[in-house]
Every structure is written in C-alpha cells, then in structure tokens.
Amino acid sequence: GDYTFLIDEAHNLVDRARSMFSAELYKKPMLELKKLFKDEEPRIAKSLGKLNSFMITMRKLTGAEPYYHQANEPKDIYPLLNKFILESEEWLASHEGSESHEKLLEFYFNVLTFMRTAEFYDERYITYVENSKDDTKLKLFCLDPSHLLSEAIKRGKAAIFFSATL
C-alpha cells in the first residue's frame, strides 16, 4: 500500500521482531482455570485438563535441565488448543462480566496468539520449553525474523530506520 514505515530504535529491531513473531503458553493458568471451571463448565475444564497433561509431557522432556528445545513444532498441542478455543467461545459470549470471564478471556487470547504464530512455524523457529520452580513455559521461538519482517515491510512503499545508538 501507500505506507511509509518509520521504525525507531532500529538497533533493537531483531530482538523486538523475534518477540513479535514468537508466542508462549504457561502451564499454571491451565491448571488454575481447570479448577475454576470444574463445576461451572466441565467441557472447558476437560479441555484445559488435556492441555495441562500435554504441558506435563513437555516438562518431562527437559529431564534434569531447566530447559529443552527442538526443531520440530509441537503439532500435538494444536488440536487441543483448537478444541479449547471452540469450547470457550460460546461460554465467553454468554458470560460477560463474570469474574471467571476475565480470567478465561485472557488465556483465550493467549491461545489465539499462539495459534496465529504457529501458522508461521518453519525452519526459522524452534520449540522451547522452560521450567521454573512453579511453572512450565512452552514457546514457539522465532530465531530468525528477517523473512517475516521483510514481508511486513514489503506492504509499504518505504521504510525508514532510526537509531540514536548506531
């Protein structure tokens, strides 16, 4: 289109682009929401239970190390996430304003972001799992954002990069 992109802090562009094109999910909210929805909406709780089990499997991949990574994308979680999206959408539409709604909505948007990011997964990505004392993170990590950045910039006529640091 007829756009000119002005990109400030260009010296941080690689890190910012990696972050923009990566996505992560945490195990802890899955378990907390599962408990919250156990009685209120069992279908959502069941869906979250399957996601929680998947995250336990991923956690075990790290062994004694705090992290693990692989080139292959975690395709087995995608059907579980899609099921969660379907189970949640109807409930979210009919329960606005409730305390549970806000908590589920936040996780729902994280899942949507994760699934959108998964569409870009190729040889420039890795699957990264990190364990902390009380949580497990699953991340689709974009190692090389240059292709996606280039595609985004091509949507405009020009791009001007600024950096006071360079």
Q: For each predicted feature, which ranges?
A:
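Conserved coupling segment at the C-terminus of the helicase ATP-binding
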Residues: 1-166
